[in-house]
């Protein structure tokens, strides 16, 4: 699996912005990726030293849409989140402007 296939996109929220001060960065990752794969991908793409990787599966939410024909329900997609802790003194430059 390619490193760019593992890291899908960064997750930017108010809470994650506060975590960046502690050297923790959040990414949406491929569901079949494991912690060693995520660590290697972040080190390859951003050229930083990774101290730890925490992962969690985010379950899709129920979505209900009201139409002329009644209600239609479905789920948003499930996805995997990874919180990557960098070694002390390390930073990812693209996040510094946020």
UniProtKB/Swiss-Prot annotation:
Molecular functions per Gene Ontology: rRNA binding; structural constituent of ribosome
Cellular component, GO, one term: ribonucleoprotein complex
Annotated keywords: Ribonucleoprotein, Ribosomal protein, RNA-binding, rRNA-binding
An annotated GO BP: translation
InterPro entries: Nucleotide-bd_a/b_plait_sf, Ribosomal_uL23-like, Ribosomal_uL23/eL15/eS24_sf, Ribosomal_uL23_CS
Similarity comment: family membership: Belongs to the universal ribosomal protein uL23 family.
NCBIfam families on file: PRK05738.2-4, PRK05738.3-2
Cited function: One of the early assembly proteins it binds 23S rRNA. One of the proteins that surrounds the polypeptide exit tunnel on the outside of the ribosome. Forms the main docking site for trigger factor binding to the ribosome.
Official protein name in the record: Large ribosomal subunit protein uL23
Annotated source species: Herpetosiphon aurantiacus (strain ATCC 23779 / DSM 785 / 114-95)
């Amino acid at each position: 699996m390619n490193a760019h296939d593992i890291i899908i996109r960064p997750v930017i929220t108010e809470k994650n912005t506060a975590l960046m001060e502690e050297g923790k960065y959040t990414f949406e990752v491929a569901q079949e990726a494991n912690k060693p794969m995520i660590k290697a991908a972040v080190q390859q793409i951003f050229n930083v030293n990774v101290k730890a990787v925490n992962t969690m599966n985010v379950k899709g939410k129920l979505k209900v849409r009201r139409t002329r024909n009644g209600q239609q329900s479905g789920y948003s997609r499930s996805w995997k989140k990874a919180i990557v802790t960098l070694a002390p003194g390390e930073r990812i430059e693209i996040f510094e402007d946020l």
